[in-house]
């Protein structure tokens, strides 16, 4: 025992004293202090084995090897005769990890970072690693301007050499920028330069992008913006000399000073293109032309490089290298641009694969492809395929990945990665207004039936005034060339009086068939035929209605409120669609134009034509497409042929969630003017117009009758949805809007009805403004809107809150 103490004391001064220069032969190895680590595992990590001759260097290597396992806080190696005694203190095992006070950083993100550093439940606690994590987290807070933040690791011992690890955060407040100074600017004012920054020392109320909270990453981005601003205006020698960020003593304020050297403005003297141009020199040189005396422009140089890469990509050169080097001549203030191009190998497509299409059949996606297998890779064709998949509306996201084929110098696989969305919707609508009360509608639509791409819909409405049923089917690829075939059958029993419209009842049924012919990538023409039977009854004597009947050779008695009429019509239906939206669901860029019309053909009782034109344009105002301006219009017009009028039941209506929000559906526009009917009883509650049997002159009502002309427009700002995580960002859309619209009757004779509103005047425009939220829920698209009408006319019916399932735009 005395010998062991002597050896321990000697170890503290010199290991050489213990083992000697020549070492000794180890006959046995004993461990002290092992709890969780097995003896066998500890022995395997040591470079020394029984029977080895051990020197001082071997002992040092043994200690290092044991520390390297990460299992021990302390290691001592002692000699007891011919036995090597290894004394260890194991690191405690982490039993639990908790967080407190963290608001800016979520628990899941913290756990991921800890696990990446090897800190997880069940592992040994490395205090050095914990200290590094503390510092790293504090550095993160400093980078986002929270200089008073602190992160402390609290380690609580538990039985059996275990510990609880708790990270306690004190995030503090973000330091706000007090002032931004730019020193050395002469050509542009400081205010002009700072106006392009994200970080600002003053943020007007209307600026939704500017931020006074300091962030290191944003400052780096702003400095790059400053550099680009000068380079794009000819300052080829522009330089940022230094940047100082000063913190106030209370760590709540930031002063930023940027020192710059503007230099002089330079002009292009020419562009020289060299290298492997793959036989496309003429096209590449056309992309690099500059005008004589044109100012040097850094953005144009970058655009040249990207355009050359895109050009070569269209011809199969998937990985070209394009480098530009400016040659600056300070004597005449010119820049000669040298562009070196290496087209590289030409690649061919071996396979096109799809991932994520669990429901949609492979053929549904493959028929949208413009890139062919076996052909050379065309980047524009790959992008067209992506755009076409997006426009289907079946997917939340579509991404492409071009993967080189191992072992092949000139082959790639093109992979389309899709995330499917619910293409079926249960269409259920509710509206509430002070005059209208509650209204309902319902239906089922499946745009990708059983993954085949067929659109199948069954829609129905059942309420106090309507029973409607419709079955529709569309095959978008009736032929291999992309000709579509669609058809529908419907039945409608409609009581207009109970719907607050002009008083009549119409029972109708019909069918139609339509073929769609793709003209090119973005244009489609449609043509088809249809049949409809209308059986009208209980028609009250109303001016516009009687005017139509007279044009049809029917001259009913003005005093009879039980008139009836029926018509069978055959129509030629036509249409045109231009669609260049970036995706079919929640688009953010591009435009869509939709023209639909019909005209009766020989054999019809009616003779008329009718057409509607819908447009929508999306313009992103930021690079991430989070802020988007949407403009929508809808125009409609119809009229009779050969002296006849368009049927009143084909009139246009406005108001409601798809036209002018804030107004009850179909209530904007002309109102019914009734003739007095002596056969109607004054106590008949089925009619609510103001005429009484004792009156002799026509009288107005609040019943909407629609018109043969319509114009609707909407301006909308789509914004990021607050309080929504990134997981649901693609499923929810928020916007503020301004709607306007009107409906008028071009045949209304204002001179004959001088005491009544002029329903032929198209300037009677209604307006509303509000907010809307759309959500692609498991049931289908949900649309909530709240709008306040601020321009309306007598007889209009407000409906501020509207809620629909199954309608998005």
UniProtKB/Swiss-Prot annotation:
Function, in words: Part of the outer membrane protein assembly complex, which is involved in assembly and insertion of beta-barrel proteins into the outer membrane. Constitutes, with BamD, the core component of the assembly machinery.
UniProt xrefs under InterPro entries: Bac_surfAg_D15 (IPR000184), BamA/TamA_POTRA (IPR010827), D15-like (IPR039910), OM_assembly_BamA (IPR023707), POTRA (IPR034746)
HAMAP family: OM_assembly_BamA
Subunit structure: Part of the Bam complex, which is composed of the outer membrane protein BamA, and four lipoproteins BamB, BamC, BamD and BamE.
Family: Belongs to the BamA family.
Ribonucleoprotein keyword on record: no
Full protein name: Outer membrane protein assembly factor BamA
Underlying gene: bamA
Species this protein is from: Klebsiella pneumoniae subsp. pneumoniae (strain ATCC 700721 / MGH 78578)
Gene Ontology biological process terms, A to Z: Gram-negative-bacterium-type cell outer membrane assembly; protein insertion into membrane
GO annotation, cellular component aspect: Bam protein complex
Keyword entries, A-Z: Cell outer membrane, Membrane, Repeat, Signal, Transmembrane, Transmembrane beta strand
Segments of this protein annotated with the region Disordered: 679-698
Localization per Swiss-Prot or TrEMBL: Cell outer membrane
Database matches in NCBIfam families: OM_YaeT (TIGR03303), PRK11067.1 (NF008287)
Composition bias type Basic and acidic residues, residue spans: 679-693
Signal peptide bounds: 1-20
Residues annotated as domain POTRA: 24-91, 92-172, 175-263, 266-344, 347-421
Main localization category: membrane
Domain of life of the source: Bacteria
